[in-house]
Amino acid sequence: MASSIDPLTRLHGILSSYLSEVLGVDRSVVERLLAPPPRKEYGDLGFPLMRFARSSNASADSIVESLRGKLWERGITWASPTLEAGYLNIVFDVEKLGDEVFRLLASGWRPSTARTSRPETIVVEHTSANPIHPLHLGHARNSSLGDALARLLEARGHRVNRRFYVDDVGRQAVVASLGFKLSGVTPRELASRMGVKVDHAVGWVYAVTHNALETVTARKRGDTSKVDEALSTLARLKERGDREVFDRILEAVGSLDDPEGLVSEMMRKYERGEEPEKSLIRGVVSAVLEGFRETLGRFGVDFDDWDWESDLLWSGLVNKIIEEARRSPFLTTHKDAIALDIPRIVREVLARDPEAASTIKLPRSLEIPPLILVRSDGTTLYTTRDLAYSVYKFRVTGADRVINVIGADQRLPQLQIRLALLGLGYRREALNMMHYDYEIVSLPGRRMSSRRGEYVTLDELLEMAKARSVREVESRNPGADRDWIESTAEKIAVGAVRFALVRPGRLKPITLDVERILDLKENTAPYLQYTYARASSILEKHGEIDYLKAHPASLEEGSRRELFVEALRFPLVSAKAADDLAPEDLASYLLRLADMFNSWYQKDSVIHEEWEGARHAKAALVLLVKSVIGEGLRLLGVEPLEKM
């Protein structure tokens, strides 16, 4: 009876185990080097055997011969090992392999990510947007990457904990809350008056209040250009929002004796958990989180835990870190504030710890300054609170690893935090947390500034994409049910945005072209959804597959063979994408597979195939490809569509 593990994963496991043992090489090295050869004529799988055989007691020929016997013992009669030019090449007998795959498909098996033999508990913290305005394009990329990572790691067999860090402490949350205090309205009341989501209303109040404060302080400094800039922004904000609330905020800020002093005092009181600041700021931030949850729900993203920054302060965790720093030999003063001497930690701790040095890689030319912990006014910095949060994530979950999805602009602070943890004795945490950074994303001709209230919200982007999708679905399905059109267009829009923000790789800046990411002829999610729908249509027209009649030898034909083997690689491809934290590799694989499928079925009809054995075999191939594309899309947060 065929194993429930897919054939290629089973083969890969046997090869990795045997070669690792006989060559005395770490299994992970073998697994990484086992790959399709550069040229098809070499075979279906290859390994640089001579590179390692020279230092082993066995000859390369004897290793290959012994391997052949091992494979037969394990029932793998469809894989033939050969030795050519120092390489172990494996050639698949597609007739025998097809027979095994057909039996699996008949039993209900579908390809899925190969499970790890070493499952871990992994925290993925992502999105964690500042709760003072709606989610924007940058957050969309963060969410798309973070959720794809979580899905991949979970599919790989890891225990994944998704966390959102609520950044409610600091100046920005106070400024937004001050605006509501001065205006006399609540976030929900204002949202109702403006006819917008509550997070959009808070974003508007934050921008108005920030620029009102900026006008006052710039006038005191005599900075006329800043005054003019703030007034220009305020004029535009007035046109976009509630004029009565706008006038109240402006008048109230103008009448304050010391507006900046008031902001600082509110910050200090909130850090201490004093009323009425505690209820005011918590109320405003909670309202924004309502808007976040609505948007993220639409985007297909959810979280296991929402961690409030203020809770870390009020629980004493932040003070514990500060006290540990005060007792540390690395305590110093920097810019009249207490700090940790990061350069000294690098010299005296990192440089003497080879494992830490190889894990926490420092850019050669980067000068890393001390990490300030507490300002001269007694308030903490966000990096201090991040230190406490880093420890908290490990302790509360028992995590083996923590992955923080945070923008590339935070590389220096994130590096400082890891080094500070190392210096304070939190070595395990420092070595097992990762800054998963990503570059910016923009729309052509649109600039972003939350302080000016200028940003492309994720809500707006999804509406733009959906409107275009509705028109496309309507044109392809005249007279279709309206609810189905709306539902399908929504899935296309969400999938298009998510896929476009993952596919290029995290370190490539993106300029998002909404028309292009929806194009069925481009490397897009809609193209993959269309391919999936096309496969569904073929299978519907074909009817039930009779696997007893399906003739696996018919898959030996060139393009069929290539497509068959490529589809069977999915469990290993997605496993490697999970291990490498590279969802873009899975995206590239799916596009390549879809290209192969679309090229094949247009030239080699399934429905009109005259020979019954080949027709059922080709239908089974369509089902295999459809299953792979569907599972791959789901791992990237894109919903497959039976019809478009």
From Swiss-Prot:
Molecular functions (GO terms): arginine-tRNA ligase activity; ATP binding
Record's catalysed reaction(s): tRNA(Arg) + L-arginine + ATP = L-arginyl-tRNA(Arg) + AMP + diphosphate
EC nos: 6.1.1.19
One Pfam family hit: tRNA-synt_1d
UniProt keywords, alphabetically: Aminoacyl-tRNA synthetase, ATP-binding, Cytoplasm, Ligase, Nucleotide-binding, Protein biosynthesis
GO cellular component labels: cytoplasm
Chief subcellular location: cytoplasm
Cited Gene3D superfamilies: Arginyl tRNA synthetase N-terminal domain, HUPs, Isoleucyl-tRNA Synthetase, Domain 1
Subcellular location as annotated: Cytoplasm
Short motif 'HIGH' region, span: 129-139
Similarity field: Belongs to the class-I aminoacyl-tRNA synthetase family.
Name by which UniProt lists this protein: Arginine--tRNA ligase
Lineage: Archaea, Thermoproteota, Thermoprotei, Desulfurococcales, Desulfurococcaceae
